[in-house]
Amino acid sequence: MHHRTLTLFLALAFALVSRAQHATNIPSLPGERWWGGATALGSKMPFGKELPAFNLFNRNDNNQVSPLLVSNKGRYVWSDRPFTFSVRQGDLHLDSPFAPITVPQKAGSTLRDAYLAAMHAHFPPSGKLPDSLFFTMPQYNTWIELMYSQNQKDVLAYAEDIVKNGFPPGIIMIDDNWQRHYGNFEFKPDRFPDPKDMVKRLHQMGFKVMLWVCPFVSADSPEYRDLAEKGFLLTDTTSQPAIIKWWNGQSAVYDFTNPHARNHFIGLLRGVQQRYGIDGFKFDGGDNHFYHRTDLVSHGGKGIVSVDHTRAWAELGLAFPFNEYRAGWQMGGKELVQRLGDKDYSWQAVRLLIPDMIAAGLLGYAYACPDMIGGGSFATFLGIDASQFDQQLIVRSAQVHALMPMMQFSVAPWRILDAQHLQAVKAMAKLHATFGHYILQCARQSATTGEPIVQSLEYAYPNHGYAEITDQWMLGARYMVAPMVSAGTSRSVVLPPGKWKDDRGRVLKGGRTITIDVPLTRLPYYEKL
């Protein structure tokens, strides 16, 4: 057998044996349900009788993962290292190649008890926030409109259309392909003839400006050769820079377990800010599966595993108040913006937004954004004529966003909507701005207490049979939101105990389920009295 093949075979065999040695089965208590592990599993939470194995080493389903599971009976599981979890006949099953995972910690009797205990023990809040503008105004991203054709003329036109159509300016993000190549942080001169002036004009319009960046470096570029010589790239067992396959091809990648590489990268970004007036960065990539290879050699040593690279990438963002992430490992309670993974343009995707946001909160990611209004997966927008969009879907998606911690536009509503639907979406942007002070207040409270901003009814009102409700949420302690997430104009709403005032000013008695009419322009929300 070839030496390299034998080495890989033995490594795999060792991993399998080790995993078998450290299996933990956790029988469920009567009525116990579990949440956690991965933001993208939100729609499956609370987990049912069966859940296929989810490996935190090499899977993230395009979003944040964390080694935390919490139950509605006040128990939680935490491990500093990644593990595989599944549910078998209602019981939680854990596999770890490192060491046995201890039995669940009993912290109380509710989901909130479990979360708070885990949070205080393992990811207490930093006391800091991303910039307040994330919470108080809508965000705008150029991705869906420009995709890989980012350019100065169209970026400015997009921003001008935002203002011209009566939307409040906020943060604007210039997405991928503004740069000459990966690892380079200069604008393409043919597309951006005067980027400094562009940023100046965007600032004059009232925007803060962020740029898309990633940890990848185009092979056979000047940056690649320089970084390789400095030892700032992740290598393989041949001591050569490892080539990683990702969604834009194959590239080398920074090794941020090397503090000198980290400081070098931050210095490059600071240079971009100084040269062009950029306010911050959208940090894409960093997914655990890119680093899950047995032949990778990192500066941090043999104990480094895939998720350690994900965390090292996330730690960069702490240097920039204007930041955004999609992939994550641990880092709950930190002042990082965490966006949901790219969602399709579909009703099914609209229905995923609320449970995924609830899941993000239960992993400690309070400062979260529910992807882009209408969807952020560009492939699902290809080939659709502007006149063929489901306009109701865009409106309902905007309504879900409006009373979340953040809302982000990408597809231009004024391009695809008629006057009636455009007005409905614009009203949601203005509603978010109106609620901005309260949302920021919730964020500041979260920075102190560590509590999620978006809370499920089970979290806020335990032991009322609310575990399965995933189309309503509490925005802080004061408001409950119940939007339409399917085509139609009516829905049932669960009112928890107490008195509630709805968006139309009516006072309602809680502790019951009501059926309400939800015309296109209505976002039902309820203030707790």
Annotate each PLM feature.
Residues M1-H22:
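Bacterial Sec-dependent N-terminal signal peptides
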Residues Q21-F134, Q152-K164, A460, D517-L529:
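Catalytic and substrate-binding clefts that recognize carbohydrates or anionic sugar/phosphate headgroups
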Residues N55-F57, Q64-S66, G127-L129, E160-I162, ...:
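Generic recognition of flexible, low-complexity loop/linker segments
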Residues Q64-G74, A359, V395-Q408, Q441, ...:
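Short, hydrophobic/amphipathic alpha-helical patches that form generic packing surfaces
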Residues R75, P82-T84, E145, Q179, ...:
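Short, glycine-/Ser/Thr-/acidic-enriched flexible segments
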Residues P130-E145, Q240-V253:
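N-terminal small/glycine-rich loop or linker at the start of catalytic domains
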Residues D161, N165-G166, K188, M198-K208, ...:
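Carbohydrate-binding surfaces of carbohydrate-active enzymes
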Residues P168-V425, E458-Y461, G476:
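Aromatic- and carboxylate-enriched substrate-binding clefts and catalytic-loop regions
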